[in-house]
Regions:
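Glycine-rich anion-binding loops and their surrounding alpha/beta cores
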Residues: 8, 14-15, 63-66, 70, ...
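N-terminal glycine-rich anion-binding loops that anchor highly charged ligand groups
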Residues: 1, 9-70, 241
Length: 288
């Protein structure tokens, strides 16, 4: 199928859902050659992915992952053991309501495309498939994207994959998260209903900061910044960025009636020490 798909894509024709899923199955099962995989990913990227092509690719990738992934380097620097087996991660999620899913332990079939992606050096559909292929099968999700044009299409993809409450965000200063230095484009999902809108830091009582103020450093430096935020020592733009994104997640999870309420809850959880306590618990339990 991959040969036929490459020809079709090179002619700027869209693949059907079934064709895209079949190609992904061939790739994930090691049936495609390196040349075929490279040609397919390049042709798909050059044509531009449709909603059906992304949805089918994510479904195919999900089918090949171990069931039950922003930065694992920071978690490691904080002391979290990140490469736990799936069974232990599932236990942590049940016992303390938090875990980290190390991609290499779940998306084993990615070994067939990882070298190709590195050599190509361009963004491909796999850049967005990871968050869409959550091994836990979460039906509530906050996802950041790297291009404005992906916001609404990926919200539709998430809904087709079973997400009932979700939010796709793009910081207009080219951040794949809710930004403290620019407006953020949002597409919210609720039981098959979509709403697109824009939010700004000022809506939540925050003073906009420069993008440079949010830049981190080494994993160790970022881990220290994280601790300063959770200890209540950092009260500038970095803390506000954390509260905005955590607040959105709290709202999407149904724990707040609005994002405004979610942001206020995030602030309170930091201020009363619950967030720091949860991190310390996560570190301790992950190392048992």
């Amino acid at each position: 199928m991959i040969r036929e798909a490459i020809i079709k894509l090179s002619q700027k024709q869209d693949l059907t859902y079934e064709e895209a899923e079949q190609v992904m199955n061939e790739i994930m099962e090691g049936q495609a050659t390196d040349v075929q995989k490279s040609s397919y990913l390049t042709a798909l990227s050059m044509k531009g992915e449709t909603i059906d092509e992304i949805t089918a690719s994510a479904a195919g990738m999900r089918a090949h992952c171990i069931k039950l992934l922003h930065n694992m380097d920071v978690l490691e620097a904080l002391g979290v053991k990140i490469d736990l087996p799936p069974e232990r991660s599932a236990e942590l999620l049940k016992e303390i309501q938090i875990c980290f899913l190390f991609a290499q332990n779940y998306h084993i079939a990615m070994k067939y495309v990882a070298p190709i992606r590195k050599e190509l050096g361009i963004r491909t559909v796999f850049n967005i498939l990871g968050p869409l292929s959550n091994p836990a099968g979460a039906n509530m999700e906050l996802m950041g994207v790297y291009e404005q044009e992906l916001v609404e299409p990926l919200a539709q993809v998430m809904a087709k994959l079973g997400v009932v409450r979700g939010m796709v965000v793009y910081g207009q200063d080219k951040l794949d998260e809710i930004s403290m230095s620019a407006p953020t484009s949002v597409c919210e999902i609720r039981d098959g209903w979509f709403q697109s809108y824009e939010i700004t830091p000022e809506q939540f009582g925050y003073t906009r900061c420069s993008k440079e103020e949010l830049v981190g450093g080494t994993p160790e430096e970022n881990a220290e910044i994280t601790k300063e935020i959770l200890r209540g020592e950092e009260r500038g733009g970095k803390r506000c960025a954390v509260c905005l994104n955590a607040g959105a997640a709290i709202y999407i999870a149904g724990k707040a009636q609005s994002m405004e309420e979610g942001v206020r809850m995030a602030e309170q959880i930091i201020d009363d020490g619950r967030a720091l306590k949860k991190l310390e618990q996560f570190v301790e339990e992950s190392r048992k």
